[in-house]
């Protein structure tokens, strides 16, 4: 089933940690493979996902990214697909590689989940059980979008007429009171000239630990 069989949804939520992990906007494709299990479970191709900035960085109400979902696969396919090898995390590499979101696949012998060392691991490279449960417990779906714009720390403020569509606080939302306004908002997003990875994630220049790492030449993407 695709969103063409129902009105396409406009999923909105606040990105509390904008590190380039969820979503992962690198290498020419935007992926949402971790966090936001409700969106990943129910979204269909053709739906639009919009992430707003966090209040802690004074980015609330501003758009960090948007993407149109054009492909949905499961974790195992994501892990094995050569198109997404660069999305596998490489700790110690550039920040784009450190925050790879292609981290889940099943052990062929036991069927148990393997969580690769990543942002969702616990300290000392241990499996982050809480993250594993949240990421895999409700759905195995990975959302993929090639039509997207990611502004990161240069989040974009929408025009005032769309402020009623802004999502604040925790959770996510797709319901709207005005379908015509929703479609106008989507059209506005698609008319913007920016596409793909536009600017670095907000946390890279604001989180103290990442800010220090970002200054190292080897960390640059």
Q: Which residues are covered by each model-predicted region?
A:
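Contiguous surface segments at macromolecular interaction interfaces
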Residues: 1-6, 36, 76-221
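Eukaryotic short linear interaction motifs
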Residues: 58-59, 74-77
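Short N-terminal edge-element motif at the start of the domain
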Residues: 1-61
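Aromatic side chains
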Residues: 11-13, 52, 65, 78, ...
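Short, flexible active-site-adjacent loop segments at beta-strand->alpha-helix junctions, enriched
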Residues: 55, 73, 154
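Short beta-strand-centered aromatic/proline hotspots
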Residues: 48, 61-72
């Amino acid at each position: 089933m695709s969103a063409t069989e129902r009105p396409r949804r406009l999923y909105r939520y606040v990105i509390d940690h904008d590190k380039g992990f969820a979503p992962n906007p690198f290498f020419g494709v935007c992926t949402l493979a971790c966090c936001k299990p409700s969106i990943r479970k129910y979204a269909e191709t053709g739906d639009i996902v919009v992430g707003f900035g966090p209040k802690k960085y004074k980015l609330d109400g501003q758009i960090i990214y948007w993407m149109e979902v054009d492909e949905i696969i499961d974790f195992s396919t994501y892990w094995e697909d050569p198109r997404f090898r660069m999305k596998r995390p490489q700790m110690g590499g550039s920040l784009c590689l450190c925050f790879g979101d292609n981290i889940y696949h099943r052990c062929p012998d036991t069927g148990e989940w393997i969580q690769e060392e990543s942002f969702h691991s616990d300290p000392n490279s241990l499996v982050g059980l809480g993250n594993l449960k949240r990421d895999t417990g409700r759905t195995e779906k990975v959302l993929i979008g090639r039509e997207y714009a990611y502004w990161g720390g240069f989040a974009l403020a929408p025009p005032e007429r769309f402020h009623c569509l802004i999502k604040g606080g925790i959770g996510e939302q797709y319901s709207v009171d005005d379908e015509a306004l929703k479609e106008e908002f989507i059209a506005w997003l698609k008319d913007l000239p920016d596409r793909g990875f536009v600017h670095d994630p907000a946390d890279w220049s604001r989180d103290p630990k990442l800010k220090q790492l970002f200054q190292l030449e080897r960390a640059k993407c």
